[in-house]
Regions:
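Anion-binding (especially nucleotide phosphate/pyrophosphate-binding) glycine-rich loop
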Residues: 38-55
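Residues at secondary-structure transition points
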Residues: 34-37, 64, 68
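Residue-level signal for short, function-critical loop segments
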Residues: 60-61, 207
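DPxDG-like acidic metal-binding loop motif
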Residues: 54-59, 65-85
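Short, charge-rich binding segments
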Residues: 49, 79, 102-103
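Oxyanion-binding and handling regions
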Residues: 1-37, 41, 86-210
Length: 210
């Protein structure tokens, strides 16, 4: 008898690499430069292996092209599957706000925005952008903001961290945040709070298409 299993996936399209989390402990990392060449093949192979029926997408902040390419590809996959995929869209900052509300991280965070030199200094308590800053200013900022935390990125040389940096992964039913020797867990229900019929690229600013 042939059993056709269904699969929940979580996809981070808001970092320096694309991260696709599937099954209990498997992760696929794609370079940004590979997206247009590898994306379709990866999604189709995953769906053939285990039918994707639910997809949580970390959908902001990041660069215009990759957000657009990924949302279009996932929407196309849903169309090809006769709309048999449930989408949930969550910004990375909303995820970090969940961590903050639980008391797991401080209120100030430096966030990757797809640029080589610049990052966002974001205030989770007041939910606002403090400023766009240069990575070279991190040590100075850490003196000004003692609770400052670095965004998770997959290339550890991007920040060359000298202060605390987030480390989290997704599993089928939860997301876990590593903090030293402690692991904190968010349930899938806490993450899938924004169901959407179609994914829209969640730009941090409007792209210039002129």
């Amino acid at each position: 008898m042939f059993l056709y299993w269904k699969m929940r996936v979580s996809i981070d399209i808001s970092s320096d690499h694309i991260a696709i989390y599937h099954w209990t402990s498997q992760k696929i990392l794609l370079e940004r430069s590979w997206v247009d060449r590898e994306l379709g093949k990866v999604l189709v192979n995953l769906d053939r292996e285990q039918a994707i029926w639910e997809c949580l997408v970390l959908n902001w902040p990041w660069g215009f092209t990759n957000l657009r390419v990924w949302t279009l590809a996932l929407n196309l996959l849903k169309t090809l599957k006769n709309n048999q995929i449930s989408f949930f869209s969550l910004s990375k900052l909303e995820l970090y706000n969940l961590f903050y509300q639980k008391g797991w991280i401080g209120s100030k965070i430096l966030v990757y925005i797809g640029q080589r030199l610049n990052v966002w200094l974001w205030d989770l308590e007041w939910w606002r952008l403090i400023s766009t800053v240069k990575k070279s200013e991190i040590d100075q900022l850490s003196s000004q903001y003692p609770d400052l935390t670095l965004d998770q990125v997959y290339d550890t040389t991007y920040f060359e961290p000298t202060i605390s940096q987030l480390s989290y992964e997704f599993r089928i039913d939860w997301c876990y945040l590593k903090s030293g020797n402690i692991e904190h867990f968010l349930s899938r229900d806490e993450l899938t709070i924004h169901p959407v019929e179609r994914l829209e690229p969640n730009y941090m600013i409007e792209p210039n298409v002129s």
